[in-house]
């Protein structure tokens, strides 16, 4: 089964989608979020989905259910829950005994049972230095004891074509040889060159993908409006839009959240790139996060898309020029989900599915690094 994967802690399927784009096929996904798994199953109907806490599943029972021999599976992937490591959690609430911080150990039990050729574990960058590196070295030690050669690194999604500044840590392990992480393909320091120069220069880095390149072709909306199953209003404008549209015919999930009267008053006063700091005193919130009530910049990548992307007070989530927060489809575009990927659930559930997942194009470069080692 050279191209088969199992996705643990799958969520809606960001990691799986990246591996799917690289040519892998999902056998099974496990997550305890029912709505996220419904989204996963809708997009990957041939994969078996199991809605349960991974701690309730015996690895040997799962291997028997999937009729797999030890060593037969190509890759086990998974983004273990990260809230217990995240810097967004106050330091006094981060501790090693937090149950969320122990789930990587359950992940490793599945590795021991299945012995896949390759392993990919994703988490927040803080996991690499959490508790004086104890977690990192425990993961290395366990995998090395099982015969794997392990590498770990934090990658910025914007350096691999994703129009979003988002850093994630990856552990990649192989039973055969030490895998190297892919080199960046995009850089904010890129200097534009004319076509003749490009033909002469190999190994150049492309410019970082911007918000305009990601969402500029989608039809305008007002707060509270949606554009479902409609046609694209114009042809794709760039390579990013081309690859995300792929063979998709109708736009889905282009839904803008309704705003309160004070939120509307705030956004109508803000220009592109401005935020709460630019609001008059009578409209400025008393307390706010950095970038809160901020409009995105057209010619820059987005800041990190979180599960709170629907709430303008939680970050820079206002559209660059329209008086609303970005739609679900726009958030998905900024996260590099193809337009063929359809999200299910309420507005907030869909926002969470995007914000808590791995950007597919970032996952794809990891998958392609594994393919090159096959």
For each predicted feature, which ranges?
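C-terminal target-recognition/interaction regions appended to catalytic cores
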Residues: 230-374
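Short connector loops/turns at beta-strand edges and beta->alpha or beta->beta junctions
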Residues: 81-85, 176, 310-311, 339-340
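A structural signal for well-ordered alpha-helical segments within the folded catalytic domains
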Residues: 13, 105, 133-137, 209, ...
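Core alpha/beta nucleotide-donor-binding catalytic domains of modification enzymes
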Residues: 2-115, 125-129, 134-137
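Proline-centered helix-kink/hinge sites
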Residues: 45, 80-81, 116, 163, ...
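Short alpha-helical segments and helix-capping/turn motifs at coil-helix boundaries
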Residues: 60-62, 154-158, 288-291
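Class I S-adenosyl-L-methionine
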Residues: 65-70, 83-283
């Amino acid at each position: 089964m050279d191209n088969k994967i199992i996705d643990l802690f799958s969520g809606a399927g960001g990691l799986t989608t990246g591996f799917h784009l690289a040519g892998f096929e999902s056998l099974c996904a496990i997550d305890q979020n029912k709505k996220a798994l419904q989204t996963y199953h809708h997009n990957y109907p041939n994969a078996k989905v199991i809605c349960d806490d991974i701690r309730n599943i015996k690895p040997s029972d799962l291997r028997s259910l999937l009729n797999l021999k030890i060593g037969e599976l190509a890759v086990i992937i998974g983004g273990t829950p990260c809230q217990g490591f995240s810097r967004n959690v106050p330091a006094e609430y981060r501790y090693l005994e937090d149950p969320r911080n122990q789930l990587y150990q359950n992940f490793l039990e599945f590795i021991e049972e299945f012995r896949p050729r390759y392993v990919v574990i994703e988490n927040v960058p803080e996991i690499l230095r959490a508790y004086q590196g104890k977690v990192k070295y425990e993961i290395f030690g366990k995998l090395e004891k099982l015969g794997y050669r392990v590498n770990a690194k934090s990658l910025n999604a914007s350096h691999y074509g994703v129009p979003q500044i988002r850093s994630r840590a990856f552990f990649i392990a192989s039973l055969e040889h030490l895998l190297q992480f892919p080199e960046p393909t995009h850089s904010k320091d890129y200097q534009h060159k004319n076509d003749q120069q490009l033909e002469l220069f190999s190994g150049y880095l492309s410019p970082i993908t911007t918000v305009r390149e990601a969402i500029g072709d989608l039809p305008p909306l007002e707060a509270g409006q949606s554009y479902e199953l409609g046609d694209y209003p114009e042809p794709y404008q760039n390579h990013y839009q081309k690859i995300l549209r792929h063979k998709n015919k109708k736009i889905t999930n282009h839904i803008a959240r309704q705003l309160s009267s004070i939120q509307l008053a705030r956004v109508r006063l803000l220009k592109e790139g401005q935020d709460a700091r630019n609001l008059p005193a009578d409209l400025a919130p008393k307390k706010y996060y950095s970038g809160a009530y901020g409009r995105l910049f057209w010619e820059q990548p987005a800041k990190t898309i979180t599960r709170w992307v629907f709430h303008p007070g939680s970050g820079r989530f206002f559209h660059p020029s329209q008086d609303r927060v970005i739609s679900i489809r726009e958030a998905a575009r900024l996260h590099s989900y193809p337009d063929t990927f359809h999200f299910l659930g309420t507005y907030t559930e869909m926002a969470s599915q995007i914000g808590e997942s791995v950007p597919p194009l970032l996952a794809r470069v990891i998958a392609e690094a594994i393919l090159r080692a096959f």
